[in-house]
């Protein structure tokens, strides 16, 4: 290898490392306020919400993966397989839209660099839940550390080293405090897409989706037990922040396989149906409708309930 070629390769490696570290911060770097351990009992004895985020999960790959748990939720719930996730096809803008109920022109997040994050008046799901009732028990678990920076005011907020650990911590929370809203973020599918390709023809990518489905199955077994024995009624939301093409997804606003995603909402008392004209800003209004919370007009949400 010539000196010139070596320098080019070295530069590419350094730039790649800088990109990765800007997106995936280690938990040791998280501010102390992002790690919270208060596992307190939920106040709602019946209505509760399980919000599941599967990072970087293409719709056609989800359908090709044939996960029994995810298939069951699709067959029982409200579904849309052509949901507009909006512009800026990377994770932080996508999750900010889902968790804040507004598009990037309001929440201001347009990249994964959130070192100067400032949502201003456009707060997150947990803040608005607290406004309605300060006593709500709220929990968030993710194995991508930046995810915990997108919300505030949880009682329990924990990072994990793997999707399996997200599942284990979710079971701990369900069995020890049963929050009113439990937010889970699984990151392995996105990681596998970057490693080997976002494609329904990629067996490694499909396996990552199936693996998450297995974890969801275990969690849903606990949810069903609680519903049958304690009379709880759980709304279950399953969404993603973006799809992908090749081994990437950034800057792909015009690619359908990246921009258009899925929504699955299992709502107690509602039969299966396919939704039309859904977008990711509709998730928060739908959750709040189920929890019988009337949004204030000052929140300026961009979406409407899907039922």
Give short role names for the model-derived ranges.
Residues 1-22:
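Sec-dependent bacterial lipoprotein signal peptides
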């Amino acid at each position: 290898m010539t000196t010139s070629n070596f320098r080019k390769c070295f530069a590419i490696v350094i730039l790649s490392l800088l990109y990765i570290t800007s997106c995936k911060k280690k938990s040791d770097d998280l501010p102390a306020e992002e790690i919270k351990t208060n596992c307190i009992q939920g106040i709602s004895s019946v209505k509760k919400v399980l919000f599941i985020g599967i990072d970087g999960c293409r719709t056609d790959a989800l359908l090709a993966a044939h996960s029994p748990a995810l298939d069951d939720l699709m067959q029982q719930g409200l579904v849309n397989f052509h949901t507009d996730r909006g512009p800026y096809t990377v994770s932080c803008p996508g999750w900010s839209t889902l968790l804040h109920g507004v598009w990037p022109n309001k929440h201001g997040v347009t990249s994964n660099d959130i070192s100067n994050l400032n949502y201003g008046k456009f707060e997150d799901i947990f803040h608005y839940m607290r406004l309605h009732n300060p006593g709500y028990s709220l929990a968030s678990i993710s194995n991508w550390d930046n995810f915990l920076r997108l919300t505030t005011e949880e009682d329990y907020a924990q990072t994990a080293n793997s999707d399996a650990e997200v599942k284990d911590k979710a079971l701990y929370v369900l069995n020890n405090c049963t929050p009113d809203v439990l937010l889970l973020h699984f990151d392995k599918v996105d990681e596998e897409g970057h490693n080997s390709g976002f494609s329904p023809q990629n067996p490694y990518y499909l396996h990552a989706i199936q693996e998450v489905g297995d974890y969801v199955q275990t969690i849903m077994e606990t949810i069903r037990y609680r519903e049958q024995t304690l009379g709880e009624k759980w709304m279950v939301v399953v969404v993603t922040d973006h799809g992908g093409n090749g081994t990437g997804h950034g800057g792909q606003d015009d690619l359908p396989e990246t921009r258009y995603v899925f929504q699955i909402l299992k709502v107690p008392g509602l039969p299966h149906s396919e939704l039309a004209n859904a977008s990711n800003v509709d998730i928060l209004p739908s959750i709040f409708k189920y929890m019988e919370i009337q949004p204030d007009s000052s929140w300026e949400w961009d979406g409407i309930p899907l039922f």
